[in-house]
């Protein structure tokens, strides 16, 4: 939408000396001194925290709108001020009076000039920080923010994601996907979306919400988020633009209540796939995939039509084999999948900790075996036998016909019992390297010795007792180091800590792909 309040609210000089010193993304709220989600008022240049922190930016606007009850309003007094502010991290502009993000500018282009000035300040601060880190590397090998890896000292550059109000489910999935190298690199190399019409023609889009409902691009906001996560210019990134697009195209996730991370991941991958099928930023899907010449036709597993990078990387194929127990008729069906949902076998569900000594520990192999074992269907799942011409008792078995490049395994920790959805808090042992999937293949003899091996890339963990509550974090490996992602906080961790986690979603990367022999 075009905001009608810019002319009266945007009064600040683009290069105003009133701006604080340092990096805009780390400016502190003038009230609570928090450096999370800073917003600058475009009327007076004061900095306040966003509504997801302590809401002082909104209170600044509200305090400025106290009506003049004892005086007749002049035309000047009637003008609305302090209504427009700019996010110091994403440079998106918001009007509290319109209660919406802003796409237009003043006649003199002041909004764009302020945006460019903030970018220059950010770049200058980043350059200064790089010089400082270089000096630290030269003068000292012991620094709290430096790590010794393979004999050389390197700086930690991982970026956290700010929690916008129970959005840890989204943050954990985004951090996990950002560490799937093939997947992440593909999106980061896509061209940026630009507006090509109206007053903002030729200008970069900073907030998808400004483009209107018909132009929101999940791919573009996902791309921008991935680019921000590993550039190292800030400690935490605010994914508000992506969150808004998620609200627009995935109504199930509207609001600020806790959501299921696995459900969000499936919706996200499905919608990325559908948007890429339709082409992106004027580049057809086929042209994008054609650039990645190492993707063979056999790897482009199709789900709902033509293949995209989503199905090329996460797509596998299951064979569902059903046998009638009365006449012996066999039915086979091939189903594509992006992830496998595994039950935790019932005999392990009372075992909550790895350190408990009563009975064997549940392993990921136990869950996979339960998924692929021959199963007799109960009375509520009778099979319609075409030979018997009626529903009959039957058995079912899954085989994996084709393994994906990235194997995503979801442990079904939430189950309905009566009217409640309870959590299975059992510890499940999982390997960091060398997960062998050969014994679950339909034709294992046709697979190579290395093609069935997988190494762990990321783990999503749910902390708490219920799907509608608790908290999500993620562990992921990047360049040989393991990180723990807890919203805006990123810390280095070790393999021993990772393997003790009660995994909810596991991302395994094909062994050859991770070794770098197969580049997307």
From Swiss-Prot:
SMART domains: ZnF_UBP (SM00290)
Gene Ontology process terms (BP): DNA repair; DNA repair-dependent chromatin remodeling; protein deubiquitination; proteolysis
Keyword Repeat annotated: no
Zinc finger motifs (UBP-type), residue ranges: 1-121
Positions carrying N-acetylmethionine: 1
GO cellular component, one term: nucleus
Positions bound to Zn(2+) 2: 29, 32, 49, 56
E.C. designation(s): 3.4.19.12
Active-site residues (renumbered): 168 (nucleophile), 471 (proton acceptor)
Record localization: Nucleus; Cytoplasm
Swiss-Prot/TrEMBL domain comment: Both protease activity and an intact zinc finger are required for H2A monodeubiquitination.
Subunit structure: Interacts (via UBP-type domain) with H2A; the interaction is less efficient than with monoubiquitinated H2A.
Record's protein name: Ubiquitin carboxyl-terminal hydrolase 3
Species assigned in the record: Homo sapiens
Organism classification: Eukaryota, Metazoa, Chordata, Craniata, Vertebrata
Gene field: USP3
